[in-house]
From Swiss-Prot:
The lineage of its organism: Eukaryota, Metazoa, Chordata, Craniata, Vertebrata. BNR repeats lie at residues 182-193, 232-243, 273-284, 468-479, 545-556, 587-598. Residues 93-103 have a biased composition (Pro residues). It comes from Homo sapiens (Human). This is VPS10 domain-containing receptor SorCS2. Glycans are attached at residues 158, 328, 362, 600, 830, 891, 902. It comes from the Eukaryota. GO terms for cellular component: cytosol; dendritic spine; early endosome membrane; intracellular membrane-bounded organelle; membrane; perikaryon; postsynaptic density membrane; recycling endosome membrane.
Length: 1159
């Protein structure tokens, strides 16, 4: 949650006091390949061209960013450091610029007949262009040609001092490499380059101006090596500076809004420091602070002026809202106004309100506190289901919010609150939005400054964007009326309802369109912006329109977008074309845009980067910032309109105009308001003391002064009365509010409430029939029990904090029966009122049922939570036979330590499948229908503990298995761990390969779990040759292996000199041969030693009819839990198996798992 509000008068510290808030305006875009990007961040309510400052943000300086631009051909570099004064010549005199003069009104040269003006004697009651006499003074900042950024501060408030910081910012390195600080004490006529440390190169990163005493300035300086940082402090508008080393690196400074010497420093290490003597001494306040979410106390709301509101991260990683006084901000003195964690970057303190959001169990809730009372949920319509919420404005004891509801993508709905900021009603749907850099959101709505209650908004429906205006804070909206004639006096042929005027408000889809509407507090009713006529807003049309009666009538003034600046309360409007070519003239109007004149402000065309006037727009002096080429120095041109006006305005110089909406109704927001404006025939200065408001008269209340209350919506236009508010289907107006406590009273809503800040009296009162009712005793509803931190799995012996919440119902008379599932039972009162958690500790693993029953005489509710208490998993081993027969059933077994029956979930990935098999058992059975290598992966998850193991299996259609046994001495040394079994299998395989010359890759020895220690030897067949029907090499390999085993040639040593002998296990058969699934099974008979050759031939000839001692087995696909051989001749034949066999079934009941088992 962040502020994304429209422009309005500032109330808090300026941007030099703190970094731009989330609601700060976005950086302006360069119009159409314009190589210089103007970023205006003015320190006072200064009149710089560009976007208006945000609420709570003053504009102390202008930052200009220079990017490469092709220099115009034939331009000479200007001289630097000297003044160049130029007065306009007489009409008709030759202009200073070479080349043919363009036509009237064209930029780049003055229009014919207007190249210079001299002041003539004032004519009584008559204004004439002959009276205009402007003085332009140019100054070049010599030596700063390489600097690509500039920050400008005009102190204002009867001061003639201007400070300019130019710097070379290296984007790749992310820091400033060079800088220069210039100071003017004559309104910008001349500048002096300041030397902060004689003989030492000083790099200034930024400067900050105190909003309450703009004579006080702080410069932030750093070394190129980034090893140290210093501040330079001034209390005389930069005439002198005092160096102050600091032990941290400043990210931004935040001045106190009322006390000039108090300042906060947010560092690059996310630490917060405070100084009470303008930066001379610093004290650490807090660490792990969220940037841009630090706020000073609000005057008139916070009791302690030294209070600081902070969003900070605690040691557990959660973000908290905390407050403390700057003189004592230790951990013991921190106050947490909200007990739980909040979402990162959501804290906003603004005027009477504090906002944040908190997400738990995948549900986000938005909270508000009015005038520092307890936090309550913001009540939006029940099924708004907001995806995002942005604060638009908070002035006049009311909150405007933009809510992106569940179905919206690039639009928001606008809601208006009651004075407490709790209950919200819809005022406008589908306001256009845009997501900018760093995930910031801009809502296309603008508050018109100078006249309260007036807003402009761009609504997007079915892809079409149209501009709307309201005069009563969103109660009613209308389209802008188009002008009947264009700037050339031709008919526009634009008639409602098919055609209206549409304006770019705050941004545009085209990044080269500024999309700015210009309004000022000092010029009420004067609105100027870029847009077009038509059925919808066109992003690339930027015609300039102006109104002087607050949007009632509009006029077109230019065909292209211009930079706009208001001087002398709007008495002079200055415009410079927003273009990528160099300019030398400006346009100005002294009659609210009815007529325009041009002035040649420099003899050499310059690329204009921006305009700036003294804060408050109350003077007639302005500065144009620019440069002749990218490689040239910065050039500042001071334009002084004061010689054109000889006197101050008197009462006879003003006329009045009355505010009205588009229907002609003059009772707006419950009053008739009239304003003063200078007559077009008067040639005088309004001056600093001018006030525009003239008179106001309270009106009688009408139904239009009321809007729909929370839970109600206005009827559609098809119904008889469009002003009727009807209850939504989910809202029962007769039900007491959720926070209605026994003994209190509440007002049943009739569906209407008066528009906040509407001052009408008498007349219609649509709330007069409201009835005060006693809050009844209500049963508890929405009871919830959870573990603090949202975990439901804990470890034995760990402290668990149970939190009980109740959304509705009485809490004072309700009793709470708590059963924690392990024998602990208790009865509580005021459990949900205090919010104190219940601390408990489970000693034994298991699943515990936690229940809370809330009951009073009106009813009851119950909440249940199942808590898993388990030890973390230590080891996981996937036990599986490495060789599998085609289409044979095989067991995959996960050996887990420690065993957690009924608490562990196993995830099995077989082959390339992304979808796992889930089981609560530690083993599964499967089959493989294709030969090749198959990877099997298992994950065991128990609570927050997850382990994984993986194995590669070979799926073959032919292989032999020979059962093995070991001498009994081995059992005493068998720890029954997977690693030990693998090592024994490897040594047996290696010895057999060495003694028989059978390739080691064709032998696999698998030692079975448990005692006695047994093993199976897998003899793999090489790939068959295409021309070979049957090979006897397999028989020879088996005979060789049997021979070395019978000869007791395979043995290995254990510790202590114990030798272990490996032999064939007596199963009644020597070996089994497994064939492919589609052919017949053939097994070679072991030749009996000593038989005659003829006997051997006869036995081989009739081997299909005489079973002998060889087992002829076929592949069986039936499932066998223990996977023993399907063909057995005795009880001992269980060891002679086919592709799936008993060696896969793990048995660990005879020996405990060793502690060094790892996954």
């Amino acid at each position: 949650m962040a502020h994304r509000g429209p422009s309005r008068a500032s109330k808090g510290p300026g941007p030099t006091a703190r970094a731009p808030s989330p609601g700060a305006p976005p950086p302006p875009r360069s119009p159409r390949s314009r190589p210089l990007l103007l970023l205006l961040l003015l320190l006072g309510a200064c009149g710089a061209a560009g976007r208006s400052p945000e609420p709570g943000r003053l504009g102390p300086h202008a930052q200009l960013t220079r990017v490469p631009r092709s220099p115009p051909a034939g331009r000479a570099e200007p001289g630097g450091g000297e003044d160049r004064q130029a007065r306009g010549t007489e009409p008709g005199a030759p202009g200073p610029s070479p080349g043919p003069a363009p036509g009237p009104g064209e930029d780049g040269a003055p229009a014919a007949g207007y190249r210079r003006w001299e002041r003539a004697a004032p004519l009584a009651g008559v204004a004439s262009r002959a009276q205009v006499s402007l003085i332009s003074t140019s100054f070049v900042l010599k030596g700063d040609a390489t600097h690509n950024q500039a920050m400008v501060h005009w102190t204002g408030e009867n001061s003639s001092v201007i400070l300019i910081l130019t710097k070379y910012y290296h984007a790749d390195m992310g820091k400033v490499l060079e800088s220069s600080l210039w100071r003017s004490s004559d309104f910008g006529t001349s500048y002096t380059k300041l030397t902060l440390q004689p003989g030492v190169t000083t790099v200034i990163d930024n400067f900050y101006i105190c909003p309450t005493n703009k004579r006080k300035v702080i410069l932030v300086s750093s070394s190129l090596s980034d090893r140290d940082q210093s501040l330079f402090l001034s209390a005389d508008e930069g005439a002198t500076f005092q160096k102050q080393p600091i032990p941290f690196f400043v990210e931004t400074l935040i001045f106190h809004p009322k006390e000039e010497d108090k300042v906060l420093a947010y560092t690059k290490e996310s630490k917060l420091y405070v100084s009470s003597d303008l930066g001379k001494k610093w004290t650490l306040l807090q660490e792990r602070v969220t940037k841009d979410h630090v706020f000073w106390s609000v005057s008139g709301v916070d009791a302690d002026p030294d209070l600081v509101h902070v969003e900070a991260q605690d040691l557990g990683g959660d973000f908290r809202y905390v407050t403390c006084a700057i003189h004592n901000c230790s951990e013991k003195m921190l106050t947490a106004p909200f007990a739980g964690p909040i979402d990162h970057g959501s804290l906003t303190v603004q005027d009477d309100y504090i906002f944040f959001k908190a997400t738990s169990a995948n549900q986000t809730k938005y909270y508000v506190s009015y005038r520092r009372n307890e936090f309550v949920l913001m009540k939006l319509p029940k099924y708004a289901l907001p995806k995002d919420l942005q604060i638009i404005s908070t002035d006049e004891s009311q909150v405007f919010v933009a809510v992106q509801e569940w179905y919206q993508m690039d639009t928001y709905n606008l809601y208006q609150s009651d004075p407490r900021g709790v209950r919200y009603a819809l005022v406008l749907q589908d306001v256009r939005s845009s997501r900018q850099a760093e995930e910031s959101v801009l809502i296309d709505i603008l508050e018109v400054r100078g006249v309260k209650g007036v807003f402009l908004a761009n609504q997007k429906i079915d892809g079409k964007v149209m501009t709307l205006i309201t005069y009563n804070k969103g109660r009613d909206w209308d389209y802008l009326r188009p002008p009947s004639m264009d700037m050339n006096g031709k008919p526009t042929n634009c008639k409602p309802p098919d055609c209206h005027l549409h304006l770019h408000l705050r941004w545009a889809d085209n990044p080269y369109v500024s999309g700015t509407v210009h309004t000022k507090d000092t010029a009420p009713g004067l609105i100027m912006g870029a847009g077009n006529l038509g059925s919808q807003l066109v992003e690339y049309k930027e015609e300039m329109y102006i109104t002087s009666d607050c949007g009632h009538t509009w006029r077109q003034v230019f065909e292209e977008e211009h930079h706009i600046l208001y001087l002398d309360h709007g008495g002079v409007i200055v415009a410079i074309k927003d273009t990528s070519i160099p300019l030398k003239i400006l346009k100005f109007s002294v009659d609210e845009g009815l007529t325009w004149s041009t002035h040649n402000f420099t003899s050499t065309s310059v690329f204009v980067d921006g305009l700036l006037s003294e804060p408050g727009d109350e003077t007639l002096v302005m500065t144009v910032f620019g440069h002749i080429s990218f490689r040239s120095d910065w050039e500042l041109v001071k334009v002084d309109f004061r010689p054109s006006f000889s006197r101050q305005c008197g009462e006879e110089d003003y006329s009045s105009w009355e505010l009205s909406n588009l229907q002609g109704d003059r009772c707006i927001m419950g009053q008739q308001r009239s304003f003063r404006k200078r007559k077009s025939t008067s040639w005088c200065i309004k001056g600093r003391s001018f006030t525009s408001a003239l008179t106001s008269r309270v009106c009688e209340c009408r139904d239009s002064d009321f809007l729909c209350d929370y839970g109600f919506e206005r009827s559609s236009s098809s119904e008889s009365s469009t002003n009727k508010c009807s209850a939504n289907f989910w809202f029962n107006p007769l039900s007491p509010p959720d926070d209605c406590a026994l003994g209190q009273t509440y007002t049943s809503s009739l569906g209407y409430r008066k528009v906040v800040s509407n001052v009408c009296e008498g007349g219609v009162d649509m709330q007069q029939s409201q009835v005060q009712l006693q809050c009844p005793l209500t049963p508890p509803r929405g009871l919830q029990v959870s573990i603090q931190g949202e975990a439901v799995a804990v470890r034995p012996g760990e402290d668990v904090l149970f939190v009980v919440r109740q959304e509705q119902g009485d809490v004072l008379t309700t009793k709470y029966q708590v059963d924690l599932g392990d024998g602990f039972k208790a009865m509580y009162v005021n459990l949900t009122l205090t919010g104190e958690p219940i601390r408990h500790r489970y000693e034994s693993p298991g699943i515990y049922r936690v229940s809370v029953r809330a009951e009073n005489t009106a009813g009851h509710d119950e909440a249940v939570l199942f808590v898993q208490v388990n030890s973390p998993l230590q080891a996981l081993y996937l036990e599986v036979v490495p060789v599998i027969g085609l289409n044979q059933e095989v067991n995959l077994t996960a050996v887990l330590l420690p065993l957690n029956p009924n608490l562990t979930v196993f995830y099995w990935w077989i082959g390339h499948s992304l979808q796992p098999l889930l089981s609560l058992d530690n083993s599964v059975t499967t089959r493989f229908s294709d030969t090749g290598d198959v990877r099997v992966t298992v994950q065991a998850a128990c609570g927050n503990s997850v382990l994984q193991d993986s194995r590669v299996l070979r799926v073959l259609d032919q292989f032999q298995v020979m059962p093995l046994q070991f001498s009994k001495e081995l059992d005493a040394y068998n720890p029954n761990t997977p690693e030990w079994r693998e090592d024994v299998g490897l040594v047996v395989t290696r010895l057999l390969s060495k003694e028989t010359s059978v390739p080691q890759e064709l032998l696999v020895t698998v030692v079975k779990p448990g005692l006695p220690t047994l093993a199976d030897l897998y003899v793999l067949l090489p790939p068959p040759r295409p021309t070979r029907k049957r090979s006897l090499s397999s028989d020879k390999r088996l005979a060789a292996i049997q021979q070395v085993l019978n000869a007791q040639k395979i043995s290995f040593l254990l510790r202590g000199g114990v030798r272990v002998l490996v032999a064939l296990r007596d199963t009644g058969t020597g070996a089994e041969q497994l064939g492919g699934g589609g052919g017949y099974w053939a097994v070679v008979v072991l030749f009996v030693i000593g038989l005659f050759a003829a006997g051997a031939f006869i036995l081989y000839k009739f081997k299909r009819k005489r079973p002998g001692r060889t087992v002829y087995a076929q592949m069986h696909n039936e499932k066998e839990q223990e996977m023993t051989s399907p063909v057995s001749h005795s009880e001992d034949v269980q060891g002679a198996v086919q592709g799936n066999h008993s060696g896969v079934v793990l048995s660990i009941n005879s020996r405990e798992m060793h502690s060094y088992l790892v996954s």
